[in-house]
A protein has these predicted regions:
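Catalytic cores of RNA-modifying enzymes
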Residues: 1-167, 171, 175
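C-terminal lobe and adjacent flexible extensions of AdoMet/dcAdoMet transferase-like proteins
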Residues: 156, 173-189
Length: 189
């Protein structure tokens, strides 16, 4: 079963449908685009006309999903953080295949002791294995964006340390990495 986030006018949707998924769900917030998708793909997809930030993805299907998305760049880190923080031991997906703004992807895959390493690196690699697939130039899109993009694949880790409240990790990393240039003791004052 497949879930696509933000299908827009359905370009990626059409390609995914060629693979004949058992079930295909899409989450599209825009009412006009949802109507367009409904007309274009009829009963081939299940449209969830809602905001991805307000949905419990684990309630969409009893099966584990393969998730595709060219995430809206302005909320991509918020979406990813939400998914990671809300993950239980039983993951609701097999893999996430997601497009990010290249700068964001570089922060997600950054190794420790590098300038890009921070909150997103820690959160993403806590429960997930992350692999960079390809950088994509603006010329590959229509309309052409002003920035480069990167495709990443996330798969569940078999072993990760459990936290009583995962939001604490998000909060602590946000505090520490928002003040990179200041002394480490400052956040504790």
């Amino acid at each position: 079963e497949v879930l696509e986030i933000g299908p827009g006018s359905g370009n990626l949707t059409a390609h995914i449908l060629k693979k004949k998924p058992k079930k295909f769900y899409v989450i599209e917030k825009d009412n006009d685009l949802s109507s367009l998708l409904s007309e274009k793909f009829n009963d081939e997809i299940n449209i969830i006309n809602n905001d991805v930030l307000k949905i419990s993805e684990d309630k969409i299907s009893k099966e584990k999903l393969t998730v595709f998305g060219n995430l809206p760049y302005n909320i991509s880190t918020e979406i990813l953080s939400k998914w990671i923080i809300n993950l239980n031991k039983e993951f609701w997906f097999n893999e996430l295949v997601l497009m990010f703004q290249k700068e964001v992807a570089d922060r997600i895959i950054a190794k420790s002791n590098t300038s890009n390493y921070g909150r997103l690196s820690i959160l993403s690699n806590w429960k997930l294995n992350v692999k960079k697939i390809i950088d994509i130039k603006p010329e590959s899109f229509a309309p052409k964006p002003k920035i480069d993009s990167t495709l990443l694949v996330f798969t569940p880790r078999k072993n990760f340390f459990e936290l009583k409240d995962p939001r604490n990790l998000e909060m602590i990393t946000r505090i520490f990495f928002s003040q990179r240039r200041k002394m480490i003791k400052k956040p504790f004052n």
